[in-house]
Amino acid sequence: MVQDTSSASTSPILTRWYIDTRPLTASTAALPLLETLQPADQISVQKYYHLKDKHMSLASNLLKYLFVHRNCRIPWSSIVISRTPDPHRRPCYIPPSGSQEDSFKDGYTGINVEFNVSHQASMVAIAGTAFTPNSGGDSKLKPEVGIDITCVNERQGRNGEERSLESLRQYIDIFSEVFSTAEMANIRRLDGVSSSSLSADRLVDYGYRLFYTYWALKEAYIKMTGEALLAPWLRELEFSNVVAPAAVAESGDSAGDFGEPYTGVRTTLYKNLVEDVRIEVAALGGDYLFATAARGGGIGASSRPGGGPDGSGIRSQDPWRPFKKLDIERDIQPCATGVCNCLS
């Protein structure tokens, strides 16, 4: 059974789960547990044409339901995933009203959740935390979480495109409205690696990994704020000291094949150092990068092992839990079908 969830009576925890839908898509056209979702969510899954996209949408919904179910102790059938107002339309969970509480078998616990999801190239992930809403209304205490997945080989083989440093530089130019001049220059000169130590092919591979590392970091940060690519300050958000995480040999371990997260990123906004956000990026296997960003709620910069920027607040255990690979049948089906013990 899935663990790594927090409650109002425990220290904050940043839970991170993911589902690899590639085996599902390769083995069946079925949509397992689709019938356990709300009708609107079932429709949203089935609207996709390609099976792999249906499976990613299904996995995204199942992860959101599971996270709410386990943290808020809400019956699966009562879970309704909402969205924040326009223009952002970010998935969220709105706690029930008092009248709704009475209809729940065990009652609403008063716990709310903050979460964010990402999906790319058949990989789906959620990062989130539980918290008790602050009666004082101080938004600075509310946690904010962002997560993003990139696939470093996403463009490989597209339309016969040559994979070279020159094609990478041309590709980077498309994103001049996303990255700052300094970030574009850092990617072009392959920051973080010695060009004399790698072959031409490996330099190209590193260049693409570096680009997608920057992309994942930027997406995770702006998704944390709720702005996404609509943020007017996108180019003013700058990352430096960025190193692309190396590919990780895939062992077939059911726990996943994550490398050591890279935590040395320096973040500035309008040239000012951002000190309240914790951000990191890690490689999964050879193709994927997962970036996570968080602030507030005891899971921001001060939650780093050893404390915050001033070295204070040492914790006995890192509240950021490692990514955990979930299996739909083993980990989610008991909760979705009402045979788990989560509410007891």
From Swiss-Prot:
EC supergroup of this enzyme: transferase
Any one GO BP annotation for this protein: lysine biosynthetic process via aminoadipic acid
Reported impact of residue 20 to G: In cfwA2; abolishes penicillin biosynthesis
SUPFAM superfamilies documented for this protein: 4'-phosphopantetheinyl transferase
Reaction equation(s) it catalyzes: apo-[ACP] + CoA = holo-[ACP] + adenosine 3',5'-bisphosphate + H(+)
Chain ranges passing through the membrane: none
CC per GO annotation: cytosol
Tagged with keyword Transferase: yes
Disruption outcome: Essential for growth.
Result for mutant: residue 217 to R: In cfwA2; abolishes penicillin biosynthesis
The protein's Enzyme Commission number: 2.7.8.7
UniProt keyword terms in alphabetical order: Transferase
Gene3D superfamilies: 4'-phosphopantetheinyl transferase domain
One Pfam family of this chain: AASDHPPT_N
Gene Ontology molecular-function annotations: holo-[acyl-carrier-protein] synthase activity; magnesium ion binding
InterPro entries attached to this UniProt entry: 4-PPantetheinyl_Trfase_dom (IPR008278), 4-PPantetheinyl_Trfase_dom_sf (IPR037143), AASDHPPT_N (IPR055066), P-Pant_transferase_sf (IPR050559)
Protein purpose: Transfers the 4'-phosphopantetheine moiety from coenzyme A to a Ser of an acyl-carrier-protein. The enzyme is able to transfer the cofactor to a broad range of enzymes with acyl- or peptidyl-carrier protein domains. Required for primary biological processes such as growth and asexual/sexual development, and activates target enzymes involved in the synthesis of metabolites such as fatty acids, polyketides and nonribosomal peptides, lysine, siderophore, penicillin, sterigmatocystin, shamixantone, dehydroaustinol, and pigments.
Family of the protein in this entry: Belongs to the P-Pant transferase superfamily.
The protein's name: 4'-phosphopantetheinyl transferase NpgA
Taxonomic lineage of the native organism: Eukaryota, Fungi, Dikarya, Ascomycota, Pezizomycotina
Primary gene name: npgA
